[in-house]
């Protein structure tokens, strides 16, 4: 967080340019081992998620009404005007449907699961425009709530900016707030300011995660929340030995804290002594007790010199009451694991059957990456989260829209795509013409004079090799953009405008004056053939009127008519093919 704040201050000073305001932390709340923080400032879902992860957490998961109450507390402490705040719920693919997908409507938490006992959607039903589709993310807001004080969920485009976001942090151990004597606090004006590992500061916390610090004024005492090695609970302390002011957390003393001699100091019972930290007490036999026990030794204060051995979690005391042996956690009933349990020394591991994966101590089936895909033909998974669309034989994905398929041919001739219910209805790829009814033949653009100079015909397309008079001399293009050079070098003659050089990477539009296109030639050929047929019919009619012999007329006119199959062609210029 410090790095983010420094960048926000130094960047405008170094460049002299205004920079967008970074989201700022506002109110925070902690409950046992979980903490939550509200950030205000415009941010997309991705930017919000990255900010939370950079602080060691993730966007908030609202799985219960308790978590929803935390959001209400954070909003009440923020004092905003119904902001929209990102939470950790997203729909990567498919469409949101209130009738399917369970209470989350097909959405998933950023932790990769969809477990929840709570949902609060602002839109209970699908609108007239139909359900919104992925990618979608969820923002929570008071403005969308059906009732005051009950923030509701709204689907939003993930690329849109919300007014802020909510982060969630989990810690293995936590400390309660410092205990301060009320009378002493009122007399000396004692105040405590807490700082958390995720950057939250304040004086009102229900719990503080391990790694937090506390500044106690006016004594100048700095305390840290830490879990001692081998203990599950954290407590307040400091590196410097000795007690601090007795009005704050009993001065840190294990037993009694006394300030009668002026400076605060810790006192121990008569049968114990003060240890090196100046706050803990130990019995006189404790210095040799740890050598007798394998893990822990607890002196018995009621019987001087006696002790009790204890073991770490996952172990149990052996028959000799001194050694510790491993406990097989996997034989417990009910089982600690949902499917498979593997015992280890002092612990255990949970595994799943093949085809399942472990998510938050539950075995779930992996989500099919093809679920909700929009592939026109077939979807093929390539990993647990990604897929690709494939097409039928003779087709290939559209480059700019890989979910759709288009006809594809890399040869001079390929079978046409014909409707089985209408055999005469056939289609060919761009750059091909239907031939013999069921075959697509490549159009040789080079024979039609598409290039002013050298030409190379390719399946479905062509290339022009530009000459020295072209702005693209020596390059390959579909239009070399021929220019007229001035042999006299007279800069005053001509139109007075400099020659236009085509922009690299953009194909110039074909000149309206140039070689006749192949479509025009085909149209002329068909028109000529039609004219010949008409002339033959006219000739037969004239000969019949002149009384020509019937046999000759039958020979000329009674013969079976030859079927002429005409293929519809377009006379406009052929677009360039990919």
Curated annotation (Swiss-Prot):
Topological relation to the membrane, as annotated: Single-pass type I membrane protein
Record's compositionally biased regions (Pro residues): 499-512
Protein's UniProt name: Thrombomodulin
Keywords: Blood coagulation, Disulfide bond, EGF-like domain, Glycoprotein, Hemostasis, Hydroxylation, Membrane, Proteoglycan, Receptor, Repeat, Signal, Transmembrane, Transmembrane helix
Tissue-level expression: Expressed in lung, liver, spleen, kidney, pancreas and lymph node. Low expression in heart, cerebrum, urinary bladder and uterus.
A Gene Ontology BP annotation from the UniProt entry: blood coagulation
Keyword rRNA-binding in record: no
Segment forming the signal sequence: 1-16
Cytoplasmic membrane side: 540-578
Function in brief: Endothelial cell receptor that plays a critical role in regulating several physiological processes including hemostasis, coagulation, fibrinolysis, inflammation, and angiogenesis. Acts as a cofactor for thrombin activation of protein C/PROC on the surface of vascular endothelial cells leading to initiation of the activated protein C anticoagulant pathway. Also accelerates the activation of the plasma carboxypeptidase B2/CPB2, which catalyzes removal of C-terminal basic amino acids from its substrates including kinins or anaphylatoxins leading to fibrinolysis inhibition.
Gene Ontology CC terms, in alphabetical order: membrane
PROSITE patterns: ASX_HYDROXYL, C_TYPE_LECTIN_2, EGF_2, EGF_3, EGF_CA
Pfam families from the UniProt entry: EGF_CA (PF07645), EGF_Tme5 (PF09064), Lectin_C (PF00059), THBD (PF25444)
Segments crossing the lipid bilayer: 519-539
UniProt topological domain (Extracellular) ranges: 17-518
Location relative to the cell: Membrane
């Amino acid at each position: 967080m410090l790095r983010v704040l420094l960048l926000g201050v130094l960047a405008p000073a170094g460049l002299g340019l205004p920079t967008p305001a970074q989201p700022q932390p506002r109110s925070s709340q902690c409950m046992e081992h979980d903490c939550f923080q509200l950030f205000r400032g415009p941010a997309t879902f991705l930017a919000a998620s990255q900010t939370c992860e950079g602080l060691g957490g993730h966007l908030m998961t609202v799985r219960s009404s308790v978590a929803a109450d935390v959001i209400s507390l954070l909003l009440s402490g923020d004092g905003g005007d119904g902001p929209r705040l990102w939470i950790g719920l997203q729909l990567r693919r498919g469409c949101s449907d209130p009738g399917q997908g369970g209470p989350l409507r097909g959405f998933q938490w950023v932790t990769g699961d969809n477990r929840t006992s709570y949902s609060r959607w602002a839109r209970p039903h699908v609108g007239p425009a139909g359900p919104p589709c992925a990618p979608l993310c969820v923002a929570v807001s008071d403005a969308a709530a059906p009732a005051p004080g009950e923030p509701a969920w709204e689907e939003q485009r993930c690329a849109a900016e919300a007014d802020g976001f909510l982060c969630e942090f989990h810690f293995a151990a936590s400390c309660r707030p410092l205990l301060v004597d009320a009378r002493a606090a009122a007399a000396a004006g004692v105040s405590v300011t807490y700082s958390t590992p995720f950057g939250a500061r304040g004086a009102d916390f229900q719990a503080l995660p391990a790694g937090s610090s506390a500044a106690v004024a006016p004594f100048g005492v700095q305390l840290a929340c830490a879990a001692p090695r081998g203990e599950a609970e954290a407590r307040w302390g400091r590196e410097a030995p000795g007690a601090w002011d007795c009005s704050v957390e009993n001065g840190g003393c294990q037993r009694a804290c006394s300030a009668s001699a002026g400076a605060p100091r810790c006192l121990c019972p008569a049968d114990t002594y003060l240890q090196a930290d100046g706050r803990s007490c130990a019995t006189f036999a404790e210095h040799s007790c740890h050598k007798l026990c394998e893990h822990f030794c607890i002196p018995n204060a009621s019987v001087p010199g006696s002790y009790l051995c204890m073991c770490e979690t996952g172990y149990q005391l052996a028959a000799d009451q001194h050694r510790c042996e491993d406990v097989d956690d996997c034989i417990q009933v009910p089982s600690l694991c949902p499917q498979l349990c593997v015992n280890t020394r002092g612990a255990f591991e949970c595994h799943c059957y093949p085809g399942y994966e472990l998510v938050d101590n539950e075995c779930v089936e992996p989500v099919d990456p093809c679920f909700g895909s929009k592939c026109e033909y077939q979807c093929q998974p390539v990993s647990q989260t990604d897929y690709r669309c494939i097409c039928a034989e003779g087709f290939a994905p559209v480059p700019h829209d890989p979910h759709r398929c288009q006809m594809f041919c890399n040869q001079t001739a390929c079978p046409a795509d014909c409707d089985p219910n209408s055999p005469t209805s056939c289609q060919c790829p761009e750059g091909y013409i239907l031939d013999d009814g069921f075959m697509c033949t490549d159009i040789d653009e080079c024979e039609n004079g598409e290039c002013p100079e050298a030409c190379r015909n390719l399946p479905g397309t062509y290339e022009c090799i530009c000459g020295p008079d072209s702005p693209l001399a020596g390059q390959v293009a579909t239009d070399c953009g021929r220019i007229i050079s001035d042999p006299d070098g007279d800069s005053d003659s001509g139109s007075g405008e400099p020659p236009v050089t085509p922009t690299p990477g953009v194909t110039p539009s074909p000149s309206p004056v140039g070689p006749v296109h192949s479509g025009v030639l085909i149209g002329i050929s068909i028109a000529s053939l039609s004219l010949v047929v008409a002339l033959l019919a006219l000739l037969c009619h004239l000969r019949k009127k002149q009384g020509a012999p019937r046999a000759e007329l039958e020979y000329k006119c009674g013969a079976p008519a030859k079927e002429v199959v005409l293929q519809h062609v377009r006379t406009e210029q052929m677009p360039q093919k990919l």
